[in-house]
Amino acid sequence: MIADLKEKAADRHDWLTRAAGFSERLTAPALRRADDEHRAGKTRQAIKTIETAFKALPHSDYLEALSNLTDDNEGQFVSRIGKLAAASKNTDKSYLMMAQAGLDKRIWASASAALEKISPTARTNQFFLMTARLAEMRRVGDESFAAERDNALRQAAIAPRGPVWWCESCGASDEQWQVTCGSCDTFGQVGWGVSNDRQNLIPAQ
């Protein structure tokens, strides 16, 4: 990344801002920019950077960053993600991230409410896996949730696949972002989203 070659913080910040604006399919530029801001003592600005990026591209990387940057307790954190989801242009994906936050913080009511807000056409395998996870957590002491869990797992097996890191050049997917595609060695084409070979599996909205 060119920003790594810049010794001055201001120059590095400028390049990271440019990189963030280049493609909303990338999380690294916003994460790096927020890290620089946090190191410079500008934590509020770092939080704003991540929140802005989250509203454009809801991603678990941003959940982790916000969890580290804020002093929120469990309820406050899930509430923060809920407010961001309501303001996001990718509402369904944002509420999926809110559900993940609710599950991670063990706030079941918030996780359930977030999952209910996701439209039927956006219910990918990740949605059903989270539904199964929620049912499994609730099953402790109440076996009535076992059937709900099992049904969600069956649905996950046949549901459309959600977004992944994938290369626009060759279509290969990976578990994590890379500057250069591991399959075709093309630079700067790996981003987050639904790959071309999966787009036709997701019902039109």
Predicted regions and their residues:
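Repeat-based scaffolding regions
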Residues: M1-V179, S183, V190-Q199, A204-Q205
